[in-house]
């Protein structure tokens, strides 16, 4: 007696699919698997450049298989291995030509050996470069001229991050409830005037770094993510701004052993005066001098190193007769903090931001810093005001540094450089 059986549907489906794949010429399982065999340097090796500035030729590597053919889709990791510096991109996928590249901004120390490694798995290619110090009076620019650095030879570094006007279409506008996009009107022009007036009357030039992009595109006074909202090209400009600033600081340190960093801004607060930000809050500035000197506020300030090297007390440096505020007021520019206005009280006041924290001496190092928030009328409102303020700044900084700058004779405790 025969018993009828029903075919297994799953088995039939498998047989049909296998037949279709074979009939359609599916992938040949016997085809060889391509394996990465080498990363070859194409350009960007053994070049000379300027500290803090991108090399004229970017490092480029080409990924090749065991037959010497270029390989697309290989993930290449770029890493600085010597000299500091920065990269526009650290992880890059090779294109159809098998190539990957990154912009290499050399480290700030011209004496340091500069080196870079490109790696894909265990396969690597190494690059080297030599850096020279920025030349006083020379202008260096980043990609598309978005960031500009006019090198100096004085121990003064001035940045203007919020005065730019460029609005390139390739950069999206920064948006969000936490985003500030107000422009500090005429601070770019004021910074340029300061550089020229110093050159004419002080026997040298300060280092000037300018963001030419409007603040809707980038905020260089914020950490990277907030500054660029994750845009890669805006990130490149941010990296250039801080790389130029680090190079300027290093040049000042190498030439003079010390320096003063000024982050230049503009405010629209009701009281027309300079607001000098040392990273101390209005509440801290309201404390009596004795409390200010004893409570460790010095270590939280952007002038930590300068204060510890000065014969004056911390409170005196902030608002005494030889403070920046008092010296500005002697030149006709009302300021806070100062002798006449030791604290802002309940009035609006900017006490310093990301740049002052990063580039001042709160975390150590020989370069101290201050954020200058300039009122509009009488400071930023035209060429005559720019020149008058710049002339006053020549006098103020000369007197301030003479009174407080570190010297070999100083017996006060030095501050070691530490990472922020």
Segments the model singles out, each with a brief description of its role:
Residues 133-419:
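N-terminal catalytic or cofactor-binding beta/alpha core of small enzyme domains
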Residues 21, 54, 69, 149-151, ...:
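Generic structural signal for beta-strand residues in well-ordered domains
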Residues 24-136:
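The feature marks long extracellular or luminal low-complexity segments
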